[in-house]
Design a protein with these regions (language model features):
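Adenylate-forming
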Residues: 38, 48, 60, 64-67, ...
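Conserved AMP-binding/adenylate-forming core of the ANL superfamily
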Residues: 23-28, 36, 44-89, 93-97, ...
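ANL superfamily adenylate-forming
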Residues: 13, 52, 139-196
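Conserved AMP-binding/adenylation subdomain of ANL enzymes
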Residues: 223-243, 251-291, 306
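Conserved adenylate-forming
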Residues: 71-76, 186-197, 202-245, 266-268, ...
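Conserved ATP-binding/catalytic segment of the ANL
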Residues: 29, 74, 85, 392-394, ...
Length: 431
């Protein structure tokens, strides 16, 4: 795959916001250290806001360490897959870091999946344990016998709410609260993790075939994408002082990387909305004054159409980001006039951890554009026939992307990995 001079020159760098560097050093450290570093730096700052209750970073780490200890006692070891099938809630944050800290692999599972869909992901990944809601326990139990799932841990939204409603018991499952209560002393193992080769997350994607495939995202892939996306934020942001409003789900890689991981890296309080409702969203904006709000087009349109959106103080949100689908330019213009903030668009895919492109905050937007590549992200358009030869800018072709965020491959799918990832003459891997 030969580079053309047009792409090799990387003309998009000239359009970066003034504070964004085109090249950076990315941590070659396990993802689990993100929580450890933040909890050490700002232990008493708020980490979450959920149904009237909150946790500090020290509390999140303490509970995550207890769960990690429990998982080790259960027999979960490095490389074992553990599923999380939850809406946005503090338990997701706690579980994800517990799994990562002991070298396990997080398998994100959509809570809206049917038993058949859960079974497909569970069987393909070989997950040994699934953490889910009490209300979803019947779906999980329905597939347990046909998969490698050995145990199901349940929790409830009410457990982490201000009312602290206990999770009801469900036969055939273990309550997460009981599991944590049984750990009186944490004993996290010292697991050797190679960030560039060890998988952190299996993110299932149907792609164009409709057959779920697990994109293997390494610790390095996701950590790099966290750095790539957070450097885009205005430089006056301060660690522990920001608030990110999260209605985009953690189980989607957009929410997992940009919300859960990047939010933790920045020490931002994560204001969690478990299910989208425009009134609940606007109420959260009024009560918490988030500084950053990533979402999808339908959410921004619903806010724009709300007759009293301004009364909730939406103009206090500093930055908005839209992903998953393009926004009409008129919607962007109307939204920015209403809020006074900046609404950036981005592009990505599960196989890229996921963000690869974004629109700069200060540059003029081009209608219909997905934006420009992130730092250290190269792109080229290749012809549709061979899929190898770069075409001239403006010509029709297939987008190819290279960068530190590109996946390791598809789980147990060597042929499809070979078809999706290709090396150039310099040995660089392109998606």
């Amino acid at each position: 795959m030969a580079d053309s001079s047009s792409y090799a020159a990387k003309p998009w760098i000239d359009h970066y916001d003034y504070w964004v560097q085109p090249h950076m050093n990315y941590p070659r450290r396990p993802l689990g250290e993100i929580l450890k570093l933040t909890a050490s730096a700002i232990p008493d700052r708020p980490a979450t806001a959920f149904l009237g209750a909150s946790l500090t970073w020290a509390e999140v780490k303490e509970r995550s360490d207890r769960l990690g200890t429990a998982l080790v006692r259960f027999g979960i070891a490095k490389g074992d897959r553990v599923g999380i099938m939850l809406p946005n809630c503090p338990q997701y944050l706690i579980a994800a870091f517990a799994i990562l800290r002991i070298g396990g692999i997080v398998v994100n599972v959509n809570p809206l999946y049917t038993p058949r869909e859960i079974g497909v992901v569970a069987a393909d990944s070989g997950m040994r344990l699934l953490i889910t809601l009490d209300l979803l326990a019947p779906n999980a139990l329905a597939v347990r016998g046909q998969t490698a799932i050995e145990a199901i841990m349940i929790t409830s939204a009410g457990e982490q709410s201000v009312a602290a409603v206990p999770c009801p018991a469900v036969e055939g499952t273990q309550r997460l609260s009981d599991v944590l209560a049984n750990v009186t002393e944490t004993n996290m193992p010292n697991v050797s993790i190679d960030p560039e080769s060890d998988v952190a997350v299996l993110q299932y994607t149907g792609g164009t075939t409709g057959v779920p495939k697990g994109a293997m995202l390494t610790h390095y892939n996701i950590f790099a994408n966290v750095i790539q996306t957070t450097v885009l934020h205005h430089p006056d942001q301060k660690r522990g002082e920001e608030r990110i409003l999260l209605v985009i789900p953690y189980f989607h890689i957009y929410g997992f990387t940009v919300g859960l991981m990047a939010g933790t890296w920045q020490g931002a309080q994560q204001i969690l909305i478990p299910k989208y409702d425009v009134e609940a969203l606007l109420t959260a904006i009024r009560d918490f004054r988030p500084t950053y709000f990533p979402a999808v087009p339908t959410i921004y349109v619903s806010i724009l159409n709300h007759p009293k959106a301004r009364e909730y103080g939406i103009d206090k949100v500093r930055a908005f980001n839209c992903g998953s689908a393009p926004l009409p330019l008129e919607v962007i213009d109307q939204f920015e006039r209403m809020t006074g903030g900046t609404l950036n668009e981005g592009y990505g895919l599960s196989e890229a951890s996921p963000v690869t492109h974004t629109t700069p905050s200060l540059s003029r937007r081009k209608p219909g554009s997905i934006g420009i590549p992130l730092p250290d992200t190269d792109i080229k358009i290749v012809d549709l026939v061979s899929g190898l030869n770069a075409v001239a800018p403006g010509a029709e072709g297939e987008l190819c992307i290279a960068g530190p965020q590109i996946m390791k491959g598809y789980w147990k799918r060597h042929d499809e990995t070979a078809g999706a990832l290709r090396k150039d003459e310099q040995g660089r891997v392109w998606l």
